[in-house]
């Protein structure tokens, strides 16, 4: 089977890491895999992580350009490759595929909770689908794609509830064997807490964790890996609460660094207000690290509620503090739960499981 993945860019991030891992895993399962990167925005280190058997095509579209030449190049490539399945990772790409035959074998994964309009009201969208590229939502044209996948039950349920579109859940996968494991040893006097995510507090909830650290006054040290538009706000908040010495911003770290160093911490916290899945939660579980996540979102789905981690009331600093204090004083229980979570995540969220399910669905739905 020949599979083509189409992606906008390739920079450090959870979705990009997932794309590399799935492409590599599909090759290992004897598929012929091509990856088309449209924008001239990619990281050479990430490109080198593709299996040598994965064929990567760089379109080199300049960011912000109004040129449409990249559409011609992409379609020529697709005709030349003659794939059995085209897997797009943004629904807006669907209308850029000209061949009706190729459109019939196209699938899309919704990588986050749905937002925006499926069918923009402006009449120009009907005649100029290229305008869909500038739509800020993530569901434009998704109702026309033959096969729709959702990364979690939370995403599937909201896509059905808000847009009446059915989808099949295929959980995102991680390379579980690449993560160093935390030893089953007690923590020190101070609990070292880590969060790995873009710094977008309105969605990811980093401000909740900073406020919790202020309440706990020295019981925890918090490290944030990642960068984003909220960094200045979060640094200012830490200063205003007079807890700069308990908060550390490491910035963006490579996937290899994360896989090597998650095990250095005592607790992983994902306090997202709105989150479709929670790939970094699975990574923490693969590191044998106790995890604490917000309720009612994708991360709590990954932990099966309190079965493989702890859950606090979404948006509540008080409950976040309460759960951290409980884990702090019952750390033997936390380590025991982390051991069970490690086995569960390897069986459920390893990328080999994800890749195999995608290949089976391509064949079944074609």
Residue ranges of predicted features:
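Short hydrophobic beta-strand element within catalytic cores of glycosyltransferases
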Residues: 290-293
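Donor nucleotide-sugar binding/catalytic pocket of nucleotide-sugar-dependent glycosyltransferases
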Residues: 139-181, 192
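Aromatic "clamp/platform" in nucleotide-sugar-dependent glycosyltransferases that forms part
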Residues: 273
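A conserved mid-protein helix/loop that constitutes part of the nucleotide-sugar donor-binding site
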Residues: 16-21, 191, 198-215, 229-235
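Conserved acidic donor-binding segment of nucleotide-sugar-dependent glycosyltransferases
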Residues: 305-306, 310-317, 326-331
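N-terminal strand-loop element at the rim of the active site
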Residues: 5-21, 25-67, 160, 228-230
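Short His-centered aromatic/hydrophobic patch
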Residues: 88-94, 110
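Membrane-proximal helix-turn-helix segments that form the acceptor-binding/catalytic region
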Residues: 75-76, 127-147
């Amino acid at each position: 089977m020949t599979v083509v993945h189409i992606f906008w860019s390739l920079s450090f991030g959870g979705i990009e890491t997932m794309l590399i891992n799935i492409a590599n895993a599909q090759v290992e399962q004897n598929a012929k895999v091509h990856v088309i990167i449209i924008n001239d925005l990619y990281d050479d280190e990430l490109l080198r992580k593709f299996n040598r058997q994965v064929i990567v095509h760089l379109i080199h579209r300049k960011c912000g350009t109004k040129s449409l030449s990249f559409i011609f190049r992409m379609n020529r490539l697709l005709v030349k490759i003659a794939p059995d399945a085209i897997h797009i990772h943004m629904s807006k790409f669907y209308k850029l595929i000209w061949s009706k035959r190729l459109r019939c074998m196209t699938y899309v994964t919704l990588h986050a909770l749905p937002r925006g309009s499926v069918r923009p009201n402006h009449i120009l969208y009907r005649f100029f689908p290229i305008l869909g590229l500038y739509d800020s939502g993530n569901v434009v044209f998704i109702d026309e794609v033959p096969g729709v996948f959702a990364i979690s039950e939370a995403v599937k349920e909201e896509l059905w509830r808000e847009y009446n579109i059915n989808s099949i859940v295929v959980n995102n996968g991680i390379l579980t064997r690449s993560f160093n494991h935390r030893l089953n040893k007690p923590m020190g006097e101070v609990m070292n807490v880590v969060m790995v995510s873009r710094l977008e507090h309105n969605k990811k909830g980093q401000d909740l964790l900073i406020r919790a650290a202020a309440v706990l006054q020295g019981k925890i040290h918090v490290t944030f890996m990642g960068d984003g538009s909220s960094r200045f706000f979060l640094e200012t908040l830490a200063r205003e609460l007079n807890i700069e010495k308990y908060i550390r911003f490491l910035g963006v770290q490579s996937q290899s660094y994360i896989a090597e160093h998650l095990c250095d911490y005592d607790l992983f916290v994902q306090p997202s207000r709105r989150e479709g899945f929670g790939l970094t939660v699975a990574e923490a579980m693969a590191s044998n690290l106790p995890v604490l996540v917000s309720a009612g979102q994708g991360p709590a789905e990954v932990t099966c509620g309190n079965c493989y981690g702890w859950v606090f009331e979404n948006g509540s600093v008080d409950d976040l503090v309460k759960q951290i204090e409980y884990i702090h004083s019952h750390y033997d229980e936390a380590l025991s739960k982390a051991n069970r979570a490690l086995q569960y995540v390897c069986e459920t969220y390893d990328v080999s499981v994800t890749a195999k399910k995608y290949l089976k669905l391509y064949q079944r739905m074609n």
